[in-house]
Amino acid sequence: MIGRLRGAVAEVGEEEALIDVMGVGYLVRCGHRTLQRLPALGEETLLHIESQWSESAGLRLYGFLTREDRRAFVLLQAIQGVGPKAAMAVLDVLSPAELASAVAREDKAAVGRANGVGPKLALRIVTELKDKPITDGPVLMSAPTSSAPSAPAKPAPTGDAVAALMGLGVAEVNARRVVEAAAAELGEEATVQALIKAGLKELGR
């Protein structure tokens, strides 16, 4: 099974992207957040892949910019009633860190903002993901700062910055290191663009 793809972004659709790897095009299903964070057409990206096989659909590839995104996708599908579509929907409104925070707070309303996830399924998700390693970092107990509960959750700036640097070919460990250093220096008000710029400067690019 395919676990990772590095190649040029050839096409981007509403639910999938075509990644050109040495002349071979791989059709990869991605969530909306992932698609929005892909580099421009023709530029190189790295996607962590979850390969799934079924008799009806054959082999399908699901792509993520970070290993945490892929891990959360797999953990969500271990829950009864959560398939690939619902798992993608959850990760479209909550990053892995935000999902871990919602689970820790038993905030089913946050999970329930995902398209197609009703109250019962949202409750099952926050219950069954208890003590699961959704993210590598510490779990924040604070609620999202958005004043409109029905609005999609804002992606974590550090996570977006790390993903952007990885899309430029920076190794994940180095991307996390420079982004975390930049976040500590710039403070919590730092924008994604500021973190990326500081990270690239630290890397000498």
UniProtKB/Swiss-Prot annotation:
UniProt keywords (A-Z) are: Cytoplasm, DNA damage, DNA recombination, DNA repair, DNA-binding
Q: Which GO terms describe its biological process?
A: DNA recombination; DNA repair; SOS response
Q: Which InterPro entries match?
A: DNA_helicase_Holl-junc_RuvA_I, NA-bd_OB-fold, RuvA, RuvA_2-like, RuvA_C, RuvA_C_sf
Please give the superkingdom of this protein's source: Bacteria
Subcellular localization, as worded in the UniProt entry: Cytoplasm
The principal localisation class reads cytoplasm
GO CC terms, sorted:
cytoplasm; Holliday junction helicase complex; Holliday junction resolvase complex
Region of interest called Domain II, as start-end residue ranges on this chain: 66-144
What Pfam family does this protein match (any one)?
A: RuvA_N
Asked whether the UniProt record includes DNA damage among its keywords, one would answer yes
Q: Enumerate the residue ranges of region (Domain I).
A: 1-65
**Which residue intervals make up region (Flexible linker)?**
145-153
By its UniProt entry, which SUPFAM superfamilies does this protein fall under?
Answer: DNA helicase RuvA subunit, C-terminal domain (SSF46929), Nucleic acid-binding proteins (SSF50249), RuvA domain 2-like (SSF47781)
Q: Where is this region: Domain III?
A: 153-205
Give GO MF terms, alphabetically.
ATP binding; four-way junction DNA binding; four-way junction helicase activity
The UniProt entry's sequence similarity note says: Belongs to the RuvA family.
Role noted for this protein: The RuvA-RuvB-RuvC complex processes Holliday junction (HJ) DNA during genetic recombination and DNA repair, while the RuvA-RuvB complex plays an important role in the rescue of blocked DNA replication forks via replication fork reversal (RFR). RuvA specifically binds to HJ cruciform DNA, conferring on it an open structure. The RuvB hexamer acts as an ATP-dependent pump, pulling dsDNA into and through the RuvAB complex. HJ branch migration allows RuvC to scan DNA until it finds its consensus sequence, where it cleaves and resolves the cruciform DNA.
Share what the entry says about its subunit structure, partners included: Homotetramer. Forms an RuvA(8)-RuvB(12)-Holliday junction (HJ) complex. HJ DNA is sandwiched between 2 RuvA tetramers; dsDNA enters through RuvA and exits via RuvB. An RuvB hexamer assembles on each DNA strand where it exits the tetramer. Each RuvB hexamer is contacted by two RuvA subunits (via domain III) on 2 adjacent RuvB subunits; this complex drives branch migration. In the full resolvosome a probable DNA-RuvA(4)-RuvB(12)-RuvC(2) complex forms which resolves the HJ.
What UniProt notes about the protein's domains is:
Has three domains with a flexible linker between the domains II and III and assumes an 'L' shape. Domain III is highly mobile and contacts RuvB.
Q: What is this protein called?
A: Holliday junction branch migration complex subunit RuvA
Species source reads Caulobacter vibrioides (strain ATCC 19089 / CIP 103742 / CB 15) (Caulobacter crescentus)
Q: What gene is it encoded by?
A: ruvA
